[in-house]
Amino acid sequence: MKRVKNPELKLLAEQLPPMALSSRQDKTVKNYLAGFQKWKQWCNKYDEIIPLPAESHFIALYLLELSNSSNSHAPVSLAFYSISWAHRSAGLNDPTKGDLPKMVREAAVRKLGQGNNKKEPISSQTLSMIIQKYANVDSDLMELRIAAICLLSFTAFLRYDELSTIKYCDVLFGKGYMKIFLESSKTDVYRVGEWVYVSSLDSPNCPVKIVKRYLRKAGFDSYTEDFIFRGITRNKNKHKRKLKTSNKPISYSTVRSLLLEVFRSVGKDPSVLGTHSLRKGGATAAARNAVEDRLFKKHGRWRSDKSKDKYVKENLTQKLFVSKNLGL
């Protein structure tokens, strides 16, 4: 862009970097920037390597080193896509399109696989135990927050990023349901937002009733753009606890530690569970109850069947179904 001399073109050129950055989700850009920074730090150790524009064979060597020192292919893939993104954003040829970088990344994926830290889904029975424990008649704000987080994550298939950014003005109640506006999600590339609908249930586990209880307990009673899930003040009298006044969404580390403690409290092994276990559990329950595939995919905001299918864990009956129905 240094070659641009015309004043009008210069003004447009100044708008180009932020426009290019906004083509990706903020979290993705942040990850790519961090990944490219690590590549630069590695390059600085060697006089012969330039990080931008980079040469394919040096990228391949970097990916190989990452592969040798990692237990998962994730760092290799992040480095690969970060370097690619940085070059394309700078208007340069993408050196990761060379055969060597691609071959090293593919070998790392084959060698290291997806890792062995996949979390198990939470069952509807386990969720019922959680609701019984944390949403009883004497529950305080902190306990109701846990119940609301668990139910919304399970019934609306929410990721942490979607859950944590829900504002009070994003939640609307109708007759027999509620709908929640998600300003953005992992698959919402163009950030247009999307409504997700959750039905009322004739059950103690009704997500609509419990979310309403939580919102009343938290003091929400008029239009506000405050986040509904925030930190909670400490008080020896648990019924005097309140949401913190600072409008900051609940952090990932807080949600994770809360959920692991909740899972432990109902007798589940927290080492095989995580924040994604609720979304995964809801998806698995929907699949086992033969929810129409199109609705299933839309409700979970998945781009592809492959992405969606990763969330579903078949039981033994389902695994045997195919071989039982071959006409033999």
Predicted regions and their residues:
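Extended, non-catalytic subsegments within catalytic or DNA/protein-binding/adaptor domains
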Residues: M1-L328
